[in-house]
Swiss-Prot record:
Designated gene of the protein: dagK
Residues that, per the record, bind Mg(2+): K213, D216, Y218
SMART domains: DAGKc (SM00046)
Gene Ontology CC terms: plasma membrane
Record protein name field: Diacylglycerol kinase
Lineage, opening ranks: Bacteria, Bacillati, Bacillota, Bacilli, Bacillales
Length: 315
């Protein structure tokens, strides 16, 4: 029996490129033995609802074509269910942090080749209160950049749009009093921002978590304590090289469970989208989602070789 694949795509991502190449994508998957259909989202939440429906119809593979927000919605549609289908990713967004982390090609046909080759690996996801995320959760004014950056600017200059908006916001940044409990430890004090990372790539910074593992069951917790503008600029420069972890104003820890609260009204960023406000409880769900990935990722330090799946190793 042929395997069934359902593509869930954002037709506006990537300058509408996927929408134009959809017929070729369907033909390519059909030739590879997949009975394939597609669904175009129209508004926020559509991808989650369609992923849930596809689960009920017992699709073998779900393919998310869009940015990190589309991928997040698809994950939220399947995360709570047993017997989850394998997940394919076609990166079509501005930054594509998750795709970068798994070395998935940015071109559509290359990403489809990864799915067709059939190698997959199980990765951690995060649960924040009652929703899920696959790449990061963060708080602080600077973390609002990804969902406050104008779409027109993103379409013109791509990932650099975030840096432009970020530097514009730097002078406005204020520290807030936070209480962060993580695996029996507590941080109580003023901080500019915090990150909970599941991969090595966040907002295009591919070395923000230089020792990231995608399947170890731990978040990487980064807290940037109250700093002046010069110190923060220095931290950002170091972060581009993966050298920020030893800065005296940076707390860098690993944790499975994290609780964050504040008396200040603080917005959250979840996989690049608005994620509500504090307080929030975070839990790492180890190796929860099975994702198609290039076979050579097994040689990367991102994957715990003790957990390597048989289908990620060449026969």
């Amino acid at each position: 029996m042929r395997k069934r694949a359902r593509i869930i795509y954002n037709p506006t991502s990537g300058k509408e490129l996927f929408k134009r190449e959809l017929p070729d994508a369907l033909i390519k998957l059909e030739k590879a033995g997949y009975e394939t259909s597609a669904y175009a989202t129209e508004k926020i939440g559509d991808a989650t609802l369609e992923a849930e429906r596809a689960m009920h119809e017992n699709y073998d593979v779900l393919i998310a074509a869009g940015g990190d927000g589309t991928l997040n919605e698809v994950v939220n549609g399947i995360a709570e269910k047993p017997n989850r289908p394998k997940l394919g990713v076609i990166p079509m967004g501005t930054v594509n942090d998750f795709g970068r982390a798994l070395h998935i090609p940015n071109d559509i046909m290359g990403a489809l080749d990864v799915i067709i080759e059939g190698h997959s690996t199980k990765v951690d996801i995060g649960k924040m209160n009652n929703r899920y995320f696959i790449n990061l959760a963060a708080g602080g004014q600077l973390t609002q950049v990804s969902y406050e950056t104008p779409s027109k600017l993103k379409s013109i200059v791509g990932p650099f749009a975030y840096y432009i908006k970020g530097f514009e916001m730097l002078p406005q940044m204020k520290a807030v009093d936070l209480r962060i409990e993580y695996d029996g430890n507590v941080f109580q004090g003023e901080a500019l921002l915090f990150f909970l990372g599941l991969t090595n790539s966040m907002a295009g910074f591919e070395k923000l978590v230089p020792d990231a593992k995608l399947d170890d069951g731990y978040f990487t917790l980064i807290i940037v304590e109250k700093s002046n503008l010069a110190e923060l600029g220095h931290i950002m420069t170091l972060a581009s090289r993966g050298e920020h972890t030893k800065h005296p104003k940076v707390i860098y820890e690993k944790a499975k469970a994290i609780n964050i609260s504040s008396f200040t009204d603080l917005q959250l960023n979840v996989d690049g989208e608005y994620g509500g406000k504090l307080p929030a409880n975070f839990l790492n769900l180890e190796r929860h989602i099975d994702v198609f990935a290039p076979n050579d990722i097994v040689n990367e330090e991102l994957i715990n070789n003790d957990h390597v799946d048989d289908n990620l190793i060449e026969e």
